[in-house]
């Protein structure tokens, strides 16, 4: 006996044989099942993938409280399921259900702030605490500091962008205390290059001022020897002493009283410079270049030396014009040779720098009131070297 559906189909298709009716009914049933499966799949795809519904066959366990999750939605973090209320920071107990990120370490859950505070890679070189990724910092060489920790180790003065500072053993010093530290460790007469070499290459980024202006040492004068009495233009120094040279840069600012750096000359350097000064008081750039090659000194050092020599020469001329008596020892100084008293070298002889190192040099002697020149190869006679 046919059921109700079959009877209804038979009445609708009364003109069709029974075999055809049975095939049509099976096809309709197959299509209805297919449509039901498609509708179920569409409903599943429309749900939130981040918070999937629980399967009624196997309920999940919460990784926080350990209980079953019967809620429609749950959280998935660190490959584990969590109740919405159970996912929180283990330090500050902040609920992380609405946070964009969370961090896990050794099975514990942390918020962003607590994770960086405890496990941050960057640490302040002063307080050794962690530095978060969103925090403003100060960098010096390879060290990183909090803004509040970037202070002078001596006076705790806060250093900001643009301030001058120095570093020693990872400690930060303000400009004044860093200079005091260097003055206490190294003698003040050391040059900047020597000081930088001994201090392990400490860089002083603020040394950009000009040199200090200080008076030189009291001048010493040599008594006349071997019957020669001539104005000594360089009476303040001899071959064994060091001349003072003003430098463009000093290791300390002009506000502090420090000794001027000194440059020492060797015997052959002084002989060459003094011999040329007797010929030309103001060498030009070409002569300075030749002198630099001859002596191994820089053009700047040579310029300063000739400048100092000209100043000393003028002082001696003024002293002689004012009375011709040296106040230091009371010696009478003769007048310098005038322009018409004769040249130091024969008129036909051109003096070059190569002549300055020749053992046969021009000798200046005093005969009555005239200045004569003659050639001498004897080392016992007075040469230009002996005059200074």
UniProtKB/Swiss-Prot annotation:
GO cellular component: nucleus
Record keywords: DNA-binding, Homeobox, LIM domain, Metal-binding, Nucleus, Repeat, Zinc
Regions of compositional bias (Low complexity) in chain numbering: 344-356
Region spans: Disordered: 239-263, 321-356, 369-388
Domain (LIM zinc-binding): residue spans on this chain: 69-130, 131-193
Cell location: Nucleus
GO terms, biological process: cell population proliferation; dorsal spinal cord interneuron anterior axon guidance; female gonad development; gonad morphogenesis; male gonad development; negative regulation of DNA-templated transcription; neuron differentiation; regulation of transcription by RNA polymerase II
DNA-binding region listed in the record: 267-326
Name of a matching Pfam family: LIM
Molecular function via GO: DNA-binding transcription factor activity, RNA polymerase II-specific; metal ion binding; RNA polymerase II transcription regulatory region sequence-specific DNA binding; sequence-specific double-stranded DNA binding
Compositional bias ranges of the Polar residues kind: 376-388
Gene3D superfamilies, A to Z: Cysteine Rich Protein, Homeodomain-like
SMART domains noted in UniProt: HOX, LIM
Subunit structure: Interacts with LDB1 and LDB2.
Biological role stated in the UniProt entry: Involved in gonadal development.
The protein's name in its UniProt record: LIM/homeobox protein Lhx9
Organism of derivation: Rattus norvegicus
């Amino acid at each position: 006996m046919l059921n109700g559906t079959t009877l209804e189909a038979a009445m609708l298709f009364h003109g069709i044989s029974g075999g055809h009716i049975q095939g049509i009914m099976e096809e309709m049933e197959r299509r209805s099942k297919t449509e039901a499966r498609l509708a179920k799949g569409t409903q599943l795809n429309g749900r939130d993938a981040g918070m999937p519904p629980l399967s009624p066959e196997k309920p999940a366990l919460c990784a926080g409280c350990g209980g079953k999750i019967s809620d429609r939605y749950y959280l998935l973090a660190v490959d584990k399921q969590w109740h919405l209320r159970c996912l929180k920071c283990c330090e500050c107990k902040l609920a992380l259900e609405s946070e964009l990120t969370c961090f896990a370490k050794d099975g514990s859950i942390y918020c962003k702030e607590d994770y960086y505070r405890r496990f941050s890679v960057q640490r302040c070189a002063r307080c050794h605490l962690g530095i978060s990724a969103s925090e403003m910092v100060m960098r010096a060489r390879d060290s990183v500091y909090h803004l509040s920790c970037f202070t002078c180790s001596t006076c705790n003065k806060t250093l900001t962008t643009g301030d001058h500072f120095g570093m020693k053993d990872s400690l930060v010093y303000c400009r004044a205390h860093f200079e005091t530290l260097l003055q206490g460790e190294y003698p003040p007469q050391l040059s900047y290059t020597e000081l930088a070499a001994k201090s392990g290459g400490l860089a002083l980024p603020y040394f950009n001022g000009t040199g200090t202006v200080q008076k030189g040492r009291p001048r010493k004068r040599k008594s006349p020897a071997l019957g020669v009495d001539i104005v000594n233009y360089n009476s303040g120094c001899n071959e064994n002493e060091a001349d003072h040279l003003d430098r463009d840069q000093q290791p300390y600012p002009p506000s502090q009283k420090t000794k001027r750096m000194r440059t020492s000359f060797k015997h052959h350097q002084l002989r060459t410079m003094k011999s040329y000064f007797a010929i030309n008081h103001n060498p030009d750039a070409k002569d300075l270049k030749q002198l630099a090659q001859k002596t191994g000194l820089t053009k700047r050092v040579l310029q300063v030396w000739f400048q100092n020599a000209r100043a000393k020469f003028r002082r001696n001329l003024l002293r002689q014009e004012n009375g011709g008596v040296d106040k230091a020892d009371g010696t009478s100084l003769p007048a310098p040779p005038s322009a018409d008293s004769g040249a130091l070298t024969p008129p036909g002889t051109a003096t070059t720098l190569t002549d300055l190192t020749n053992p046969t040099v021009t000798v200046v002697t005093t005969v009555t009131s005239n200045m004569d020149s003659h050639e001498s190869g004897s080392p016992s006679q007075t040469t230009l070297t002996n005059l200074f």
